[in-house]
Curated annotation (Swiss-Prot), chain A:
Keywords: Cell inner membrane, Cell membrane, Membrane, Stress response, Sulfate transport, Transmembrane, Transmembrane helix, Transport. The chain crosses the membrane at residues 22-42, 67-87, 102-122, 139-159, 188-208, 217-237, 246-266. This is Sulfate transport system permease protein CysT. The gene is cysT. Gene3D superfamilies: MetI-like (1.10.3720.10).
Swiss-Prot record, chain B:
Disulfide bonds: none annotated. Part of the ABC transporter complex CysAWTP (TC 3.A.1.6.1) involved in sulfate/thiosulfate import. Probably responsible for the translocation of the substrate across the membrane. Residues 69-272 form the ABC transmembrane type-1 domain. The chain crosses the membrane at residues 20-40, 74-94, 108-128, 145-165, 207-227, 255-275. Pfam families: BPD_transp_1. It comes from Synechococcus elongatus (strain ATCC 33912 / PCC 7942 / FACHB-805). GO terms for cellular component: plasma membrane. The lineage of its organism: Bacteria, Bacillati, Cyanobacteriota, Cyanophyceae, Synechococcales. This is Sulfate transport system permease protein CysW. It is a multi-pass membrane protein. It is found in: Cell inner membrane. The complex is composed of two ATP-binding proteins (CysA), two transmembrane proteins (CysT and CysW) and a solute-binding protein (CysP).
Amino acid sequence: MSLRLPSLSFTWLTRLSWSWRFTWVYLTLILFIPIIALFLKSASLPLGRIWELATQPVAVAAYEVTFGLSLAAAALNGVFGVIIAWVLTRYDFPGKKLFDSFIDLPFALPTAVAGLTLATVYSDKGWIGQFIAPFGVQIAFTRWGVLLAMVFISLPFVVRTVEPLLLELEVEAEEAAASLGASPSETFWRVILPPILPGVLAGVAQGFSRAVGEFGSVVIISGNLPFDDLIAPVLIFERLEQYDYAGATVIGSVLLLFSLVILFVINALQNWSSRYNG
Amino acid sequence: MVAFVKARRQIAGVKESKSLLPLALIGISLLYVGLIIIIPAANVAVQAFSEGLSGFIKNLGDRNLQEAIRLTLLMGVISVPLNTLFGLAAAFAIARKQFPGKSLLLSVIDLPFSISPVVAGLMIVLLYGRNGWLGPLLESNDIKIIFAWPGMALATIFVSMPFVAREVIPNLEEIGTDAEEAASTLGANGWQTFWRVTLPSIKWSMLYGVVLTTARALGEFGAVSVVSGSITGKTQTLPLFVEEAYKQYQTTLSYTAALLLGGISLVTLVLKALLEARTGRQSRIH
């Protein structure tokens, strides 16, 4: 008996070891070789040229717009995401199920459609834009539009990471805090927020990462003006259209490096979150 | 007023709270999601029918739109089976083994989700484009990948790669090996065990992954846009068609294509909810 079990599971694995080989071949062809192609292309340029291309003023302005607005969008969704997750886990109201499924729409709706409809609704004559235009604020084709598109596509992340954490939270702790005389805001800051904070931050980081890389919705709603509302992915696209492969590659490598760093951060936050919640 | 608030609170199912807080929080949530998601979503349908049903049907007959539909379906037909196969293979290779670097490998599989679609497309251009690493080799053999469907398919495969793997891996870890070992003991070979025991127990998570893969494959814009050149009627998928028609001021035509894509995403959400109900799991996004 003691011999049988290991040998059984072992034959099972060896018989399916095609899976191991297939996985590596597929990853190599689809993922590794393209990534290496990008870095090799960057590395084939002289170091000074790389620096020059990576830090040219139009690129630096594009990084600022991209990272700044993505961070703003992620932070906004951090605040509202917690509220929405709270509402979904604690309250009942008519149409809640429908409301719940709308949260996932940004994830299912193609980004081009999102950009198109946001650009229409928030244009000067659009359903919502017409009420904002009199205040002198134009949303479509400005930085506000870019921010709006980024808010749209990164909205689900915080909601969906915080929801399960709120479900696990013990209501007793809140009730105890309240019965000991804590105000709702004290209860929130001292009792509710600490255990969900790593999850909130992980969701914010995911949303941030998604917003930084976003192209489809932003390119449609943005005016794509350099030094104004041009984001880095659109700049890469334009460089490619002008057959400036070196420029596209270097800016692309900057974004890729950023993705790798933020992936590491998200992993660390998720580990922290799961440790926190046992 | 007091009666009204009381009634609202009962609807909200909050009885002991004396404050207006729940109502306010529900209101804020509805307003936020309404302004950012629900109203824009409703706008897609309204705009698509802005010339009435007959206008919508006439637009559906547009030759370039139909070509875009065909190409979009082709992207799905190519990338969904391949990525499903990969997801299953990766799950079998990884899920039940403990080895150093396992969590790193799982992160690597997730990489396409964190790489900007434009950068993904750029990588494929640098590899297969005319000035790319394999460019001369492909050109001398008369194989066209960039500005043609094979490159678009590669881009689509890239961006939708992780879905099945990341759904099936945790599922496979969860179900354990008892049933398979029993099947083996009863004389089933590897493939019999796979088809009769393993596959049925992971089919829902696999389907969940397939639904998400399909939605992404049919809706991808950035990566496909970079490699396709977006030539109307030739290398234009539906999402590219949406942008192009909008830029050409054919707004209603653009919204016709957008509504088709919106319909796909509605179906996705419904299937997703059904599968979540069946597997009893929380909604997850990527």
